[in-house]
Amino acid sequence: MSTTIIGFPRLGEFRELKFTTEKYFRKEISEEELLAAAKDLRAKHWNIVKEKGITEIPSNDFSHYDNFLDAAFLFNVVPASVQNLDLSDLERYFALGRGYQGEKGDVRALPMKKWFNTNYHYIVPKFEKDTQVKLAGHKIFDEFQEAKELGLNTRPVLVGPFTFLQLSDFEEGVKADDFVDSLVAAYQEVFAKLAELGATRIQLDEAALVKDLTAEEKALFLNLYNKLLADKKGLEVLLQTYFGDVRDVYADLVNLPVDAIGLDFVEGKKTLELVKGGFPADKTLYVGIVNGKNIWRNNYEKSLAVLEQIPAENIVLTSSCSLLHVPFTTANEEFEPALLNHFAFAVEKLDEIRDLDAIRNGQGSEALAANKELFATERVGENAELRARIAGLTDVDYTRLPAFAEREAIQEEAFKLPALPTTTIGSFPQTKEVRAKRLAYRKGELSQKEYDAFLAETIDEWIKWQEDIDFDVLVHGEFERNDMVEYFGQNLSGYLFSKNGWVQSYGMRGVKPPIIWGDVTRLNPITVKWSSYAQSRTNKPVKGMLTGPVTILNWSFPREDISIKDSTLQIALAIKDEVLDLEAAGVKIIQIDEAALREKLPLRRSDWYEDYLDWAIPAFRLVHSTVASDTQIHTHMCYSEFTDIIPAIDNMDADVISFEASRSNLEILDELKAKNFQTEVGPGVYDIHSPRVPNEGEIDNTIEAILAKVPSKKVWINPDCGLKTRGIPETKESLIRLVEAAKAAREKL
């Protein structure tokens, strides 16, 4: 057998790519310097993979921003507004992901969506009537050549044509079938050029095959691949899937003239069953056996038991998905060895793949023995009191009374807010000063008293500023928080925190998911101090800001020894205690963010309710079920596709929900109207993930579009997400325009 991985993290061991790219954005280094730094980083990563004994090394899994955006740029699926900018290729590329506002023009960023059921986000290209699909880029060739010059014959990786079409947007009057021939021709041109350069095999990532497929989608897939594989230009083709099984197309897949097929044996419920039913002897099977999404050590005995059942003759061991979704290495962590031994980040997963290959080939007995010993030892005990509390929950604990309509009237009288009330999602910019003070406090260089004084002063400034520009519902800004999950986890039992466990989320932004190690309980009040302080500084309502249980779970590395449902209920009870403490402290509007609710929704619709929504939605209701009727519960959701789960979202029984809508052209509003959505809504009126400031009239037009779909009495005006990562000048300018636009819209009601 041989070994490989689907892809490797790209930010770098210490997020070098992030920091270098941000210097470029700030014009502190040149384009040439950025490209040189990226080239050095790629070489370092390839060398790591090689030294770990992995026999097939991928290339083009690196990206300056997003691999899906790379494919759009490669195939010229770029809007005319960006094509026409008098900028370099790299500047136009970044304009697609971040937007551009400068002397050369003003364009918005392309939409951003969750990458399947992960916390990674991809940039969504749009096929327009005048889109001319053709080979227009050279990144895939450049990186293959770079590796070749280092003595490595890599396997280039590229988003497959079916997934590329499935996950892209289309202008009205345009459909995927219109681009099949031109896209196939462009892919074949890539094949030909790679073959010319000396490549022998290409990896086409077709993750969209693990979803429910209609007859039309299957027909599109087969049409694409029958045409594409008719002339492979001398290359071998690996069709790689991940995040689930390919039950809808397996029979067709194994009969295609591909040379290799990659399947997920970790998340693919039916993968083993499908393969045991037969796999062609003339194809190589890439077995995704090491989990690319979680950080726990692989149980070698369990993996070997799966491998023994696979009838395929030609096997390559690989990760279940790209290692992009886990941190770089445990080598820089400071956990006790007894803890650290249980974790495998990207570099350690290379060891696991190599170990499994060696054991299967009659070697690696020491590695197997050590692994057996690790899994034979009990890792963590149970919290009996917590388990009893969960066992005692009944239907009443998940139901808030009175019903929404009655609460809505009570809250209208209690708060007396104007029509189209204005608010923000929660966080304000975390400046260098804020981060420096937090670091100094952590290092003991700043006393508790000094740090508290700084936070109080900062909160005072922003409360006053919000009052000055006449926001209706204020926020305290979350200056004390490093991360919306880690901050809570630090006050919960059962959590561990890595020092350098960064994972890419979107663009150059990384998140550092905490690790759920054991049973979760609240250790002490978490947010009451600063939320109640902020409320004491104003007569206007200030929102208490919490992260919801489903998001805390989904943005953590979950346990594998108990179900995610049970872990979520534990977290829900901890957050419930916090909600009640906030309410008792006089905070009457409480936002419980469920930014990641959609994230772990199963990819197959048939699994949505039984496997997820039937416990995730009640877990949210459990958190707020016992608050008073005049306490208003808000929730917020980030970049996701919600249109297909609108009834479930309404069933969360929040009083107000805010969500991203600006980048996706308010598409969700039609569905809210169609489903008679009851919860009050705050569709984001401008995109905070781009540094551009909305133009004069831009927010006014967005509000007008919202009011055409949603009754004004149901509408709140807010940005589409928190403002932590933005700069102060752009934030203030944008929010002033938001308040002005809301007031102007009120005048027209």
Swiss-Prot record:
One GO molecular-function entry: 5-methyltetrahydropteroyltriglutamate-homocysteine S-methyltransferase activity
Residues annotated for L-methionine binding in this entry: I425, G426, S427, E478, D593
EC number(s) recorded for this UniProt protein: 2.1.1.14
Main enzyme class: transferase
Keywords for the protein's UniProt record, in alphabetical order: Amino-acid biosynthesis, Metal-binding, Methionine biosynthesis, Methyltransferase, Repeat, Transferase, Zinc
Necessary cofactors: Zn(2+)
GO biological process: methionine biosynthetic process; methylation
Metabolic or biological pathway: Amino-acid biosynthesis; L-methionine biosynthesis via de novo pathway; L-methionine from L-homocysteine (MetE route): step 1/1
Residues that hold Zn(2+) according to the record: H636, C638, E660, C721
Cofactor binding, note field: Binds 1 zinc ion per subunit.
Chain residues that bind L-homocysteine: I425, G426, S427, E478, D593
Positions with a binding annotation for 5-methyltetrahydropteroyltri-L-glutamate: R15, E16, L17, K18, K114, W555, E599
Domain of life: Bacteria
Pfam families documented for this protein: Meth_synt_1, Meth_synt_2
Active site: H689
Leader sequence segment: none
Catalysis performed (reactions): 5-methyltetrahydropteroyltri-L-glutamate + L-homocysteine = tetrahydropteroyltri-L-glutamate + L-methionine
Function according to Swiss-Prot or TrEMBL: Catalyzes the transfer of a methyl group from 5-methyltetrahydrofolate to homocysteine resulting in methionine formation.
Family: Belongs to the vitamin-B12 independent methionine synthase family.
Name under which the protein is recorded: 5-methyltetrahydropteroyltriglutamate--homocysteine methyltransferase
Lineage of producing organism: Bacteria, Bacillati, Bacillota, Bacilli, Lactobacillales
